[in-house]
Amino acid sequence: MKCDVRRGKFLSLFTAHYSLFTFLILGWIMTCSISATAYALEWGSKELETEKLAVQFANQVKKGGYGLVTTEELKEWLDKKEPMLIVDTMPLEDSYKKNHIPTALQIEFPVEEMSQLDEAKKAALEELLGPDKSRKIVSYCGFTKCGRSHNAAMWAVKLGYTNVYRQPGGIKAWMEADYPVEKGQ
């Protein structure tokens, strides 16, 4: 009889531990599942944002008719002393005077795409870019999402300049690469 009682206690303990173990395993699986779902949703939303920006950027380049240059390539061009004009399109006081790519000249453009260029801005841009329509011109702004450099490059092409590039990473990528900057005018 004692054996039966012990067996009953053993089965009772085993069942309780088994139930607890099963509960813990199921809890862990659910936690992992929820975490994986949350991660997938978060990762997916970041991927959608990246895709949206990539398509928007590609459309700007296509519409603008200009080339692209990476931050590293621009640094190489500067190191080789290639003849070019670098155009900083950020605000003079808030950005250009604080930090700009060496040799860059400044002309401010708006962030939103410009469908028209008024005569004063057109004259200022043509004066800055000069008479040589084949001159290498590189525009940049603050960072990839900024549209200022797109506007400058697009309008340089519309004005007949044929060797126009945009450095999309802007001053932010330049400084993150730990490249030298100039300050002031």
What residues fall within each predicted segment?
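Active-site neighborhoods of enzymes that stabilize oxyanions during catalysis
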Residues: 178-185
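Positively charged, proline/Ser/Thr-rich regional signature most characteristic
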Residues: 63, 73-137, 184
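Bacterial N-terminal signal peptides
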Residues: 21-33
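Catalytic cysteine-centered active loop of the rhodanese-like fold, especially the PTP/DSP P-loop
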Residues: 122-168, 172-174
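Short, solvent-exposed loop/turn and secondary-structure capping segments
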Residues: 97-100, 150-152, 177
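Flexible, polar/low-complexity N-terminal or interdomain linker segments that lie immediately upstream
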Residues: 30-86, 90-95, 185
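Short polybasic linear motifs
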Residues: 1-8, 13, 19-20
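Solvent-exposed coil/turn segments that connect beta secondary-structure elements
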Residues: 90-92, 142, 179
